[in-house]
Amino acid sequence: MRYLTAGESHGPRLTAIIEGVPAGLPLTADYINAELKRRQGGYGRGARMKIESDQVEITSGVRHGLTMGGPITLNVTNLDHQKWQEIMSAADVDEKKKGLRKITKPRPGHADLVGGMKYRFDDLRNSLERSSARETTMRVAVGAVAKRLLEEIGVEVASHIVTFGGIDINVPNNLTVGEIKERAAQSEVSIVNPDREEEIKAYIDQIKKDGDTIGGVIETVVGGVPVGLGSYVQWDKKLDAKIAQGVVSINAFKGVEFGVGFEAGRLKGSQVMDEILWSEEDGFTRRTNNLGGFEGGMTNGQPIVVRGVMKPIPTLYKPLMSVDIETHEPYKATVERSDPTALPAAGVVMESVVATVLATEVLEKFSSDNLEELKDAVARHREFVKNF
């Protein structure tokens, strides 16, 4: 399975094309729209979420609610484009109109300046439009298709926030993936500890009042993963490496860890390695899950536990200093719409990206022209592993 996304933040629409999805997978626009709605939620979201109400249109690859095995095309209209038709016109316009909403003052922390240098733009809006987090709309749409596929083979994906700015959420131990999903869904800030809800919301309110932004750490957990996805035979076949690349590709993500993660650098080997157990009922299992579900770049049957760190949103209502690319004079950076935090939405994006990487790996390992063929292959593999 592979996919491409296209579209600009203020363009007419966003598009994704997905190739390699098995025939016979039940898929509806309503299912995808429910995931898109999750991305637009969360405490602290700003004006654009009131403007946009994302609705997907499926224009190929699905007939009568079932995938057909061909490329699936997904489109989401940008309702905000109505105000930007001349500014974002694909056709040539006169010089006066070209100058409308021109950006020459790059914002620190964004792709504006480096994009202008790389692609030789004199209007940094060209960098802003494609590098915008608006693109993650289609990552979530693609991820919805991936999650729909994973559901069919008993794989469940959930995400929640474990650190909000400088505040660590005290996460209860031994929550199942289903419990994490349920608790996070009930929280406006996507946390699984309701005792911290009001504290976090008050913190976000204060950050907004200060004209600042915060980042944090998001954890995605995946249960029911078949053993042996990924491989140790080449560096680029290791599944944890593929997931790491996917997570860090999300706007504003700066780091990733699995299981105990960077804490492993402070612990002894005897405290980190997961002891192997066996029972007639369950086959091989692990006593702990410090390695986050991976050994040798392969899934080991334990839940996948991956965390990504998101930097604060770089657009500030108290803008930092920058330099105009035309005059080279210092200036306060251009202010675009911004939120004090996008952590809950970013959690949905991360969850979607991880699901997409996993679905791609599942389809690479197992026969999958048709959904029933895939389900049969996965079931036979699970039985073999259990009896190993």
From Swiss-Prot:
Can you say what this protein is called? Answer: Chorismate synthase
Highest taxon, organism lineage: Bacteria
Residues engaged in binding FMN = 130-132, 251-252, 296, 311-315, 337
Alphabetical list of Gene3D superfamilies matching this protein: Chorismate synthase AroC
- So, what pathway does this thing act in? Metabolic intermediate biosynthesis; chorismate biosynthesis; chorismate from D-erythrose 4-phosphate and phosphoenolpyruvate: step 7/7
Protein task = This reaction introduces a second double bond into the aromatic ring system.
Tell me what reaction this enzyme catalyses.
5-O-(1-carboxyvinyl)-3-phosphoshikimate = chorismate + phosphate
Key word Nucleus present: no
